[in-house]
């Protein structure tokens, strides 16, 4: 298994956010790219009152603690000025982790041969959820092989990249070894408390 070529930080994501998370992504993504990082995912949850989780990485898939700190220092003031949350929130900056989301075609290429869970936004032959070994994309599709397919059912599917709603790697011993070899094991999260403008201290 060989590493896929590095992709430019501006490779477009296949899977993007909606609502408030989409607004956060719109604010922070240009600055992340300016620092040499690329956005993986934004999530806004009700954890700890309100938590904004921003997942980022370098184009080679690495993300150190120092990288998380640099990202936090840069984007925290941007979020304070634009105030997309509208209330006090807890900011978390993290690496994608070993069982990372797959949000770009390059992610599927980089981790070809590893196990992943994929959920389609549009059903294929009556099903939306797949778990199996992903292959490198070919054009607009990516193949997923299903080792545990029942007799009489397809052992693989060609999934349209544009139809993927969510995808992430499955944590396995092989994946852990490969992540450590590549130096893409997760960095410690950088966390901070942020108040919406005008909120009491």
UniProtKB/Swiss-Prot annotation:
Localization in the cell: Cytoplasm
Keyword set includes rRNA-binding: no
Region (Disordered): 180-201
Compositionally biased tracts (Acidic residues): 188-201
Transmembrane segments: none
InterPro entries, per the entry: Ribosome_maturation_RimP (IPR003728), RimP_C (IPR028998), RimP_C_sf (IPR036847), RimP_N (IPR028989), RimP_N_sf (IPR035956)
Keyword hit for Magnesium: no
Pfam entry (one): RimP_N
Alphabetic keyword roster: Cytoplasm, Ribosome biogenesis
Gene Ontology cellular component terms for the protein in this record: cytosol
GO BP: any one term: translation
Source organism, top-level taxon: Bacteria
Functional summary from the UniProt entry: Required for maturation of 30S ribosomal subunits.
HAMAP family: RimP (MF_01077)
Family label: Belongs to the RimP family.
PANTHER family documented for this protein: RIBOSOME MATURATION FACTOR RIMP
UniProt-recorded name of the protein: Ribosome maturation factor RimP
Biological source species: Methylobacterium sp. (strain 4-46)
Gene for this chain: rimP
């Amino acid at each position: 298994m060989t590493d896929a070529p590095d992709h430019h930080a501006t490779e477009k994501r296949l899977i993007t956010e909606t609502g408030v998370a989409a607004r956060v992504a719109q604010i922070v993504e240009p600055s992340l790219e300016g620092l040499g990082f690329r956005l993986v995912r934004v999530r806004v949850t009700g954890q700890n009152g309100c938590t904004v989780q921003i997942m980022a990485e370098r184009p080679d898939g690495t993300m150190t603690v120092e990288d998380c700190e640099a990202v936090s220092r840069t984007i925290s003031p941007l979020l304070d000025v634009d105030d997309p949350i509208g209330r006090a929130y807890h900011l978390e900056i993290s690496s994608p982790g070993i069982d990372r989301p797959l949000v770009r075609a390059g992610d599927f290429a980089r981790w070809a041969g590893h196990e992943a869970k994929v959920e389609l936004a549009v059903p294929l032959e009556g099903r939306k959820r797949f778990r199996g070994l992903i292959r490198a994309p070919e054009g607009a599709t990516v193949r997923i092989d299903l080792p545990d397919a029942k007799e009489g059912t397809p052992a693989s599917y060609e999934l349209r990249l544009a139809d993927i709603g969510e995808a992430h790697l499955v944590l396995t011993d092989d994946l852990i070894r490969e992540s450590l070899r590549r130096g893409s094991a997760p960095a410690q999260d950088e966390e901070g408390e942020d108040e919406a403008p005008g909120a009491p201290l």
